Structures are given as C-alpha cells and as structure tokens.
Amino acid sequence: MEREGLIELKINVRDYSKYFLSQNPFPAVGVPEEFPRITVDRELIKLRFQNVISEVINTNKTIITVMVGEYGSGKSHLLKLFRNSVNAQLLTRETGALAVYVKSPGEDFSDLFFAIVDGIGKELLVDQINRFLNEELNTSDYSKLIFDTSIRDDYVQKKATIRQILSKSQYIEIFKRISKKYFGQIKSTDAIFSFLNLAHPDNSTKAWRWFLGQRLGKEDLEALNADQEIDVNNAYQLFLDIVNILRIMGIKHLVILIDELEKITLLPSTKRAKYQDQLRQMIDDNPSGMCFYFAIAPRQWDALTKETTALVRRLAANWYVLDDFKTSETRELIEAYLFSVRTPDYKADKIRNVLPKCEPSLYPFTNDAIDAISKKSKGVVSNILTLGRISLEILQEKPKQYPVVTPELINKEIEKI
C-alpha cells in the first residue's frame, strides 16, 4: 500500500535465466569501461597500434597518429584498451613504456597537463619514486641528515623504510642533494621537490594536490619547498620537466592517448590558436621516445584540417578512419556479450531442438534480428549495445508476445535510440 506523497518501491530483479543468461550483458550507460573486457573485430586497428608502439620502442622516434571516428564508434574504448595493454606488458625496467589516457584536452595546456598527471596516477608515481629513493638512499650515505637516532641506526643497517627516513630527517636537504645529483637539467625546482615529496608520508597529499593544480596555502607550499602553483603560464614548461623526470625514473617511452580532440575546435579563435601552437610545440619539443595518439570525430576533423596551421600539418601526416560495424561485426559483438554471461546450463543442442530459427550462440536473438539491429544502429557500436540491452528488456517484459528477439520487436517496440 502506498503512503501519501510516496510511491511504493519494489526492488525487482530481472530474470534472464530462461535465455541461459545470468543477467543482461549489455551496458546500461554508453560510457567506456576503464578496463574494457570485450573488443570485437578492430584487428587492423589493433595491429596499427602494435606497429606504432614497436616503432617508438625500437627506433626511439616520436610517432603521431590520429584516429577519426563517429561518436559511439568505440574510440574511447580502444584508447583505454591501448593504455591498459601498454601498462600491463611494457611498463617494465627493460622497456620502460608508460601509457596515459586523457579524456579531453580541455581548454588550454594547463588542463591537458593536469589530465596527464591524473592519468598517470598518484600510485604509479609514488611507486616509481619509492623505487628510485630506495636505491639512492641505500647506495649513498644520508645518515647525518636523519635526526631520529633509532631510525638512523635502522638506516645504517638498511632496515628503515622510505617513509620512516623522510619523516624523521631533514628531508628538504636530502631532496636538495638528490636534485643536484640527478635533476640538474630540470628547470623547475618546484617540480623536482613536489615530485620527491610524493614519497613523504606527511607531504604526499599536498604534493599531489600541487600537481593537480589545486590551491595550496603558504605553509603547504613551504612544506613542499615550492614557490608557486601551476597555471596556464607555467604548465607547458612543467610538462617538459615531468617528462624528463619520468625518464630519469626509468620511463623511457611515454604514450599519450588524447580523446575528444574536437574540443579544441570549439574554443574562441585567439585561444584556439594559442593552444594549437602549444600542442604543436609539445610535438616538436619531444622528437624521441613519445607517442601522441589522438581521437576526434569526423566533422570536427574536417573543420580542423581546413585550417593551415603547423599543428594540422603534423597531425594530417598520419590519420585513419574508424569504420562503422558491418552486419558480420554486429553479430560478433552481440555474440561476445551474450557469451560473457552464459549460465552453466547453456547447451547448444537444447536451443537447436526447441528454436531452430535461433543460432545457439546468438540465442535469444534470431539472425534476422541481427540484420535489423545492424540496420537500425547504422553500425555505430554504442547504438548496437543499446539496442541489444533494450531488446532483452522487452523480451523479459513481454515473453508471450516475443519468445525471442525478432525484427518485429526491434522495429515496432524500439522507436529511436
């Protein structure tokens, strides 16, 4: 019974077990997963990326690539897949390749800088710094700068942790020595000290906030031994410094995957021209060990390439189009999602005997339904997934009217996507 002014909420669980599915496998929201599980077709695209990475690592040259695709075609999905593949397989001391996904270039270079730092992640940076400091503190003598006698004794016996050493020492003096020894070519001392402070137990959060452009008080800046915060005026130089610091840490190759490049076409002309010139400068100032991989929508790519700028000349040298899915690829995508949630009692023979119109791997979708989805979706991946999800929901809601997913269900029940 409903109370006045309220609706009675019942938590209903949709049961898809009669279709040999543990749940509806298609995503409810068209947002790419952080760690994509299912990637269908795109073999040529993946091969292209493999070749780009191989060339960057084997020749140490910088490579620029632009992927052009409609909204919903899977650009973000692929960029995240590229990032995860590099970091899972090539982020080693031998290869030293790190990939960073950037959701959007933002409105100026400071936005891009903050996104790159955030994309790298605090955890990875702290791991790199701890490994670096552990080697340095155990091969050089810093005992005189440790004021806690018990920690100093542990340090001499190589028992003290990085956190213990830094929290009970003149850590700024330690960082100054390390800076002079390793970071002489880095222009910004703020970047050096904030970077090293990421390993300090009391200053790590402050240092991370500094790198993300968040406001810090005078005391926090003093704790980091930093003079100024990051803004649009110093972001580009800090980017160059961070790239060099990462190389000192052992990151020899950096892969920057920038999504939604079309955002720069929406900027006012003066601001757009300045930002484009900084992006061009970013490419020119990093002739080795880098991969800049951009994604952009076709209409905005056409608009961008009509501009005869230095950035466009660099981008237009290597680009390709991400094609929409054909019927065969639509089928393969739906099949893969269904397979990911098949129940243990799924048996192909059961389906063949009861529903000969359905291929077992596609059940409860008929072959004609796949054709209808391909046509209605126009081959756009996000549309295919949306149609798949809605089809199963309707099937579950109207089982007597639709025992399986048919073209009639798709065309009559789903008006627009």
Residue ranges and their predicted role:
Residues 54-58, 81-94, 281-285, 309-314:
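Short, surface-exposed basic-aromatic patches at helix termini and helix-loop junctions that form
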Residues 77, 142-146, 264-267, 400-402:
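Eukaryote-specific, cytoplasm-facing alpha-helical/coiled-coil scaffolding segments in long proteins
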Residues 51, 55, 118, 194, ...:
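Short, hydrophobic/amphipathic alpha-helical patches that form generic packing surfaces
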Residues 2-26, 40, 44-46, 201-365:
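The catalytic "switch" region of P-loop NTPases
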Residues 5-39, 68, 88-89, 93-126, ...:
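Extended charged low-complexity segments that act as oligomerization/scaffolding linkers
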Residues 2-5, 165, 177-180, 187-198, ...:
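C-terminal alpha-helical "lid" subdomain
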